[in-house]
């Protein structure tokens, strides 16, 4: 717990005291709602009503609606509301969508470009989501579920079956951590903790719940000066001929490929793709640590599985 909190503080300090100030000097700005002009607030609110509001689903908890399921590592907005008639405080949850852009461009001119984060847009436009209802407070939070395999499962006779079952069940595995913002309103945090049966040790007040990977969107702006030159790997001499049978190449000799200096696409990806389409291949066994979002290897493995290969 201490290590995680320390790491989070280090990341936040690096972002807020180094990266963001350095980008500001280069004309790349990150704005809060209060930084926007009135016309800009209306522009962003219009974007919210047209493009974001239709995909949001608020789930309020009352006698007829139980506490909603919250998926692993998804960020949510917890909101405390007052019922119009009784004045009773109730909880509502809105999942923060990750399928859409996390950054909205507010200004872009010769002086630079300014962005506002999706979460900042959400918390300042909740009145469109809950018209006529008093919003008492709101809090961004995230849960972590236990998706580890049990130790005895690692030695099961059919590990493939265990993994498949684990993947099905992990969605509903127990929550082991609740992350909330620093100085979050206690009622919301306590309510969520109670519903998820968490103790105080399971609740982490984080200095930032920022999704640091979302900053990858910012790299798409046209600022060559701020980017490293793209790396173009060379193609290994044995794989230059794309029509040559890769299995024949491997049969003739061992081939050593050095990544990232030599192309992964023309070697490993090509090897897996060829295996997936070759009728003489009955099984593909590979250990993948992680893949990119649009991985050609995953596409090849899916194709192989759909065509009866193990």
Language-model features, listed with the residues they occupy:
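N-terminal localization/anchoring segments of enzymes in phospholipid and broader phosphate metabolism
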Residues: 1-310
């Amino acid at each position: 717990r201490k290590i995680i909190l320390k790491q989070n503080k280090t990341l936040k300090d690096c972002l807020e005291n180094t990266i963001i100030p350095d980008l500001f000097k280069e004309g790349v700005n990150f704005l809060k709602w209060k930084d926007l002009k009135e016309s800009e607030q209306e522009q962003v609110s219009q974007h919210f009503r047209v493009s974001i509001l239709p995909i949001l689903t608020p789930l309020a908890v009352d006698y007829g609606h139980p506490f909603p399921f919250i998926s692993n590592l998804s960020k949510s907005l917890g909101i405390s509301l007052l019922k119009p008639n009784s004045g009773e405080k109730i909880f509502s949850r809105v999942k923060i969508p990750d399928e859409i852009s996390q950054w909205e461009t507010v200004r872009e001119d010769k002086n630079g470009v300014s962005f506002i984060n999706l979460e900042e847009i959400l918390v300042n436009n909740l009145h469109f989501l809950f018209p006529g209802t008093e919003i008492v407070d709101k809090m961004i939070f995230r849960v972590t579920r236990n998706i580890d395999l049990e130790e005895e499962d690692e030695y099961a006779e059919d590990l493939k079956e265990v993994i498949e079952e684990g993947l099905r069940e992990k969605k509903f595995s127990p929550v082991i951590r609740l992350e909330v913002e620093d100085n979050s309103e206690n009622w919301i945090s306590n309510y969520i903790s109670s519903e998820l049966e968490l103790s105080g040790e399971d609740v982490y007040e984080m200095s930032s719940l920022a999704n640091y990977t979302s900053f990858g969107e910012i790299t798409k702006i046209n600022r060559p000066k701020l980017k490293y030159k793209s790396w173009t790997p060379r193609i290994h001499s044995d794989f230059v001929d794309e029509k040559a049978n890769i299995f024949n190449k491997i049969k003739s000799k061992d081939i050593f490929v050095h990544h990232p200096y030599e192309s992964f696409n023309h070697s490993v990806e090509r090897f897996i793709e060829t295996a997936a389409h070759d009728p003489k291949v009955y099984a593909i066994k590979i250990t993948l640590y992680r893949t990119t979002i649009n991985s050609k290897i995953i596409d090849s493995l899916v194709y192989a599985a759909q065509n009866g290969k193990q």
